Amino acid sequence: MEKLTLSPISRIDGEINLPGSKSLSNRALLLAALAKGTTQVTNLLDSDDIRYMLNALKALGVNYQLSDDKTVCVVEGIGGAFQWQNGLSLFLGNAGTAMRPLAAALCLKGDTESEVILTGEPRMKERPIKHLVDALRQTGANIQYLENDGYPPLAIRNQGIFGGKVQIDGSISSQFLTALLMAAPLGEGDMEIEILGELVSKPYIDITPAMMKDFGINVDDYNYQRFLIKGKQYYISPQTYLVEGDASSASYFLAAAAIKGKVKVTGIGRNSIQGDRLFADVLAQMGAKVTWGEDFIQVEKSELKGIDMDMNHIPDAAMTIAITALFAQGETVIRNIYNWRVKETDRLTAIATELRKLGAEVEEGEDFIRIQPLALDKFKHAEIATYNDHRIAMCFSLIALSDTSVTILDPACTAKTFPTYFSEFEKISKNQ
């Protein structure tokens, strides 16, 4: 297995221009494909998950031109539901941001009835999709499980979604609601979505209506409890759509600066629609100096204090706090993060396991993690298993800010969202 050893870093200094957000990139591509008109999507992320979406769109008859550097994509919208040859199979890797929205969009009524199969890697077949399928079935969608109930692969017939009242469980993933919201305007009738339970990752939900509005559709949101969307509408191309820098990916550079230096991250700012921008506020609460601009966030180190906080609203970026906690004074508790368990891997167990290898004292609860700090000279060298999870690989790069080197196994797994992560991290790592 490939491995990468990072030597101890004495300070962090520099500027990072963020690649496009994964979730925004895939949503923008899908909306552009469904819209009337041609859309130029810029600052598109070049990564595995985006390639799975692009390959699926091509198989569904969508024409697009991708620039040589793969960051600009001109998409010719089809102006309604997808059409495809019966028996099509789409392989979506482990890309939840492709699987969930496509599962909903492919239910929309086509001119000719056809079946499509959505499948992916073994881990994708372990990632729950029942809450979305249950909701789609309430609207009249025809979806079958091909292996295990509640999980991909799925067989979908484009017989339509017919609106009405729909209840969806919001406790596992905000992507289920996102998928339903994006498909609803092209359905056969008006839809009223009622959220059961506490909606997780609320700021991630805010992204979806904001993007839908850019493509000409309004969503009425009643305090995250109910959403109303009119049916029989069309998305209209905004002609160009700029994908914001990935706020989750910003977290590693910002945390590195909070621990040992100063960094300016561009491509995201105070007006970002991404919830993970709030990560910088958590660093500020821990003691870091944070400066916000229209198109940048700057963080400078200061003495960090541990924190006890519900981080359900920023689950991806919260992982970075678990590492930052080692460098703070006093214990850190990250709460209400059960949804870590249903991501690319069971992130709660994975992070607790790898932190212990470093010599950290960690308590793993069902939906929380408690971490004690470590003195810089007390870190043990460890080989960090990454579980084919891009965010674990990126998080644990921060261990090199101690007095000990760290070895990351399978570093190439960052290709899911940030193929050039380690070279970017090296640019801001100084050793004098």
UniProtKB/Swiss-Prot annotation:
One of its GO terms (cellular component) is cytoplasm. Disulfide bonds: none annotated. It is an enzyme of class 2 (transferase). GO terms for biological process: amino acid biosynthetic process; aromatic amino acid family biosynthetic process; chorismate biosynthetic process. 3-phosphoshikimate binds at residues 22-23, 27, 173-175, 201, 316, 339, 343. Belongs to the EPSP synthase family. This is 3-phosphoshikimate 1-carboxyvinyltransferase. It comes from Histophilus somni (Haemophilus somnus). The lineage of its organism: Bacteria, Pseudomonadati, Pseudomonadota, Gammaproteobacteria, Pasteurellales.
